[in-house]
Amino acid sequence: MSHLAELVASAKAAISQASDVAALDNVRVEYLGKKGHLTLQMTTLRELPPEERPAAGAVINEAKEQVQQALNARKAELESAALNARLAAETIDVSLPGRRIENGGLHPVTRTIDRIESFFGELGFTVATGPEIEDDYHNFDALNIPGHHPARADHDTFWFDATRLLRTQTSGVQIRTMKAQQPPIRIIAPGRVYRNDYDQTHTPMFHQMEGLIVDTNISFTNLKGTLHDFLRNFFEEDLQIRFRPSYFPFTEPSAEVDVMGKNGKWLEVLGCGMVHPNVLRNVSIDPEVYSGFAFGMGMERLTMLRYGVTDLRSFFENDLRFLKQFK
């Protein structure tokens, strides 16, 4: 009991010198453990008279409490220092720019298709689709394209065999629709088409959209008004538009539509015409009762004109520097 103060002082000195939590725990065991110096002081109580034991026990407990408080204080200091050191090692320079989240965007051709579908959807047109591997009847014969027509030549069309081919136009969708339902018909048919050609303004695969109306009392005036409104809506300009007489086997009369470019020159944008009576007969629709108009346009060409793209192949090269311009 006489050297109790010395034990407390010794314990506090050891505590203050502990450099980490592990060393501090060794000090705790040395002084407060089961066989620690201060714990063993309790065994000396039995040597005292009974009436002195409570007071002596209180003194020992007070000494142990002082050491425990010193341990707690030092442990808090060491843990705080360790935390500060870890935080310093993990410091983040908040002035550095964060990682950018790259948002995707629609392909410019997809944007064009969506824009056109939206316009014609408001006019009551529905979207129709068909197979890309087509037979010669739906791609040619039913559309009033005879066997000797140049479009059937190998250098223009990808043939699988004598009767199957990659469709050269989405007009086959019109034939399938007219075979499946009677007028009134009002559809647009977007999709991929294939032609054996590749240069700055042509690719072997491109996107086309065709439109078809079949009903009673449909005239060329209806066709002109519809396309006139469409082109001004698509280009968002009060464009000068002209219709030039042309020839397509599946329409009569036929026309090609031009718009005046910013350079003062006419630019061809689409082809159109009144559905040929032979086409209506091929799908069992009476041309004496019903009439209709059809139009077809290349999605890549319209996209090029709208955004000022000069090379059609840019749409298929997957160059992000090009595609990001259309987000």
Swiss-Prot record:
Which PANTHER family does the protein's record reference?
Answer: PHENYLALANINE--TRNA LIGASE, MITOCHONDRIAL (PTHR11538:SF41), PHENYLALANYL-TRNA SYNTHETASE (PTHR11538)
Full protein name: Phenylalanine--tRNA ligase alpha subunit
- Its gene is pheS
> Which residues bind Mg(2+) per the record?
E252
* Keyword Cytoplasm applies: yes
Main localisation: cytoplasm
Q: Which Pfam families match?
A: Phe_tRNA-synt_N, tRNA-synt_2d
**InterPro entries, alphabetized:** aa-tRNA-synth_II, aa-tRNA-synth_II/BPL/LPL, Phe-tRNA-synth_IIc_asu, Phe-tRNA_ligase_II_N, Phe_tRNA_ligase_alpha1_bac, Phenylalanyl-tRNA_Synthase, tRNA-bd_arm
**Can you state the subunit structure given in the record?**
Tetramer of two alpha and two beta subunits.
What is this enzyme's class at the first EC digit? ligase
Q: What is its EC number?
A: 6.1.1.20
The prosthetic group or cofactor this protein requires is:
Mg(2+)
What is catalyzed by this enzyme?
A: tRNA(Phe) + L-phenylalanine + ATP = L-phenylalanyl-tRNA(Phe) + AMP + diphosphate + H(+)
UniProt keywords, alphabetically: Aminoacyl-tRNA synthetase, ATP-binding, Cytoplasm, Ligase, Magnesium, Metal-binding, Nucleotide-binding, Protein biosynthesis
Species this protein is from: Shigella flexneri
Q: Name one GO biological process term.
A: phenylalanyl-tRNA aminoacylation
Gene Ontology molecular-function annotations: ATP binding; magnesium ion binding; phenylalanine-tRNA ligase activity; tRNA binding
PROSITE patterns per record: AA_TRNA_LIGASE_II (PS50862)
Cofactor binding summary note: Binds 2 magnesium ions per tetramer.
Subcellular location per UniProt equals:
Cytoplasm
Q: Which family does it belong to?
A: Belongs to the class-II aminoacyl-tRNA synthetase family. Phe-tRNA synthetase alpha subunit type 1 subfamily.
**A single GO CC term, please?**
cytoplasm
